[in-house]
Every structure is written in C-alpha cells, then in structure tokens.
C-alpha cells in the first residue's frame, strides 16, 4: 500500500508578509513619540518615580529584543532617542533593575467579531544551569532550574490573550481557570482547545462557567457526577470511543493546537533562557516577550492555504 503524498501549501499574501518581515527590523516601530515618558505626580508621600511604566517597558523591550544587559540597554536607549530627535532622559541600569520587579507589563491584542477560540498549552524555559551542549559534553555541573509558561492564544489572530508564569513543578490543571479569568467577562468564548493534561474537573467546570465548549483529549473513564461539565465530557468520550480518536480530532479541529506549539517556538526565539533570577522580574520579562510577539503579529502574518 502506497503512502499518500504529503500536502502542499502556498502563501497567498507573500508581498505584504515580506514587507511585514522587513518592518520587524525597524527600531522606530517600538517608539511612540506620544507616549508619556515621565511619570505623573500623584501627590503621595515619598519620592515619586521619574519615569512612567510605559517608558520602563519600552526600555526593557529593547533589552529583550536584542538580548542586552541593563547597562548596554541604557546606552542603546541614548542612541535611539538621539536618532529620533527626542531630548528625553534615559533611566540608568539601577532604575531599570528596580522597576522591573514591580512592572506590570501590558501587551496589546486584536479582537475579532464572533466568539473567541482559545488554544492553550505550556512550555518550560530555563533560567539557571548549563546549556544543552555543555551539559551533554561535560555533564551537569550545577543544578538546572526551569520555569513554566502557560499561554492562551486566539486562533483567529494568533495573538496571545493570557499568560501565566509558574514554577517548573506546577501542572497545567490549576492554571487553566486563571488563564480564562484574564479574558474579559463581556467577551464570549466559543471553544477552549487543550491537551489531556487539562482533562480535570476544575478545568471543565471553568470552561462551562464561561459558556464555552471544551476540546480536550479525554484519557480516562466516564465521570459519575451529574453536572454540566461531566455530561459534556462524557458525551465527547463516548463519541471518541464510537468513531475513533482520529475522526474526533478532524471533526473538532483538535489539530489546530499545533499552532500554539509553534507559538512556543516564537517565544523561545527571543532567548532559550530568561536573564532575571527572581520571580517578579522573570514574570515581567515573559510579559514583555508576549508584547513583542503580538506586535510582530500586528505588522502582518502569513496567510497559507492548502493547494494539494
């Protein structure tokens, strides 16, 4: 029996996508001349901050984008503002280090008409320990530590809508409800696609509470509880057993989950490890990476169709 020929795909918007890729290399797409660079005076006791959160996030975005230490980041900011013709003061490396611990980085996203279809997955990212080649060649010389990044992506726009940053030992089940809580209540969620690690009562209950449909691979037996989450899961499990898992994946579009796995590669393209060593700066660094990825998506993405 001969194997079927592999599918062939074609990019339909190559001209605009090529222009978007060129724009990603421009430094000025990150600089908004209308941003509030200096922090407003709030009238509180103590010394007020000099720079706004937007200014600190912009400086740290340049740091993450070019993988620079803090001192080199401050020097590059001086050159960048001089090129733009802006006479703005630049925070030093000590200010960037302290403000990163308390920064709540903001990342923009695009909203589309209709229900929101979420793709959920997680990956590990290293912040301490030897590199892979050094560990394989010479052995592990010190303890290697990881953190876990949980993402929820919009299937229509490929923008990251929610992110959580946890220790490496934490599982996916407690985090899925927290990801759904980051979606505004007035925004309708259509489906939530995740792997079998989220096949838990807590996850199904959180999805049903948002009036969404769970597309999660089922690995266990039927639940005996009589609740909306259990009934929806049991019906899917019966359909999987009757028609087969391959048909269920095609019917529900479960294979779209591979797109969130590809987005993990985009996240690690900005660095296989995170530079910060403390949890709060690490969270800010991951959020800044998400902001960079969403900004790249806003410039333009490839539209690929199957031709054969």
Give residue ranges: language-model regions:
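Residues that form generic nucleotide/phosphate-binding pockets
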Residues: 20, 99, 106, 179, ...
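Polybasic low-complexity intrinsically disordered regions
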Residues: 40-57, 61, 65-71, 75, ...
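Basic, low-complexity segments
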Residues: 1-45
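Helix-centered, glycine/charged polyanion-binding patches within enzymatic domains
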Residues: 2-10, 196-269, 275-276
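Inter-helical turn/loop segments and adjacent helix faces that build the functional surface
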Residues: 83
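Short, solvent-exposed helix-loop connector elements
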Residues: 44, 137-140, 243-256, 269-287, ...
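C-terminal domain-tail junction helix/linker
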Residues: 6-8, 14-22, 276-308
């Amino acid at each position: 029996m001969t194997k079927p020929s592999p599918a062939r795909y074609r990019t339909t918007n190559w001209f605009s996508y090529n222009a978007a890729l060129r724009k990603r290399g421009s430094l000025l797409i990150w600089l908004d001349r209308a941003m509030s660079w200096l922090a407003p005076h709030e009238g509180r006791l103590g010394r007020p901050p000099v720079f706004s959160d937007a200014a600190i996030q912009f400086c740290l975005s340049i740091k993450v984008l070019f993988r620079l230490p803090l001192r080199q980041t401050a020097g590059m900011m001086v050159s960048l503002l001089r090129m733009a013709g802006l006479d703005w003061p630049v925070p030093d490396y000590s200010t960037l280090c302290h403000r990163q611990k308390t920064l709540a980085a903001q990342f923009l996203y695009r909203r589309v008409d209709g229900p929101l279809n979420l793709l959920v997955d997680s990956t590990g990212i290293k912040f301490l320990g030897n590199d892979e080649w050094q560990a394989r060649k010479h052995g592990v010389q010190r303890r290697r530590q990881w953190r876990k990044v949980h993402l929820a992506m919009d299937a229509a726009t490929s923008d990251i809508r929610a992110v959580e940053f946890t220790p490496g030992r934490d599982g996916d089940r407690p985090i899925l409800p927290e990801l759904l809580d980051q979606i505004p209540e007035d925004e309708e969620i259509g489906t939530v696609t995740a792997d079998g690690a989220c096949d838990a009562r807590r996850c199904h209950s959180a999805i049903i509470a948002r009036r969404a449909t769970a597309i999660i691979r089922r690995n266990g037996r039927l639940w005996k509880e009589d609740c909306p989450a259990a009934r929806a899961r049991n019906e899917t499990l019966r359909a999987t057993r009757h028609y087969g898992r391959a048909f269920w994946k095609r019917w529900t579009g479960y294979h779209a989950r591979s797109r969130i796995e590809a987005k993990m590669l985009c996240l690690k393209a900005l660095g296989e490890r995170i530079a910060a060593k403390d949890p709060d700066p690490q969270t800010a660094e991951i959020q800044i990476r998400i902001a960079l990825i969403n900004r790249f998506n806003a410039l333009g993405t490839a539209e690929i169709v199957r031709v054969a």
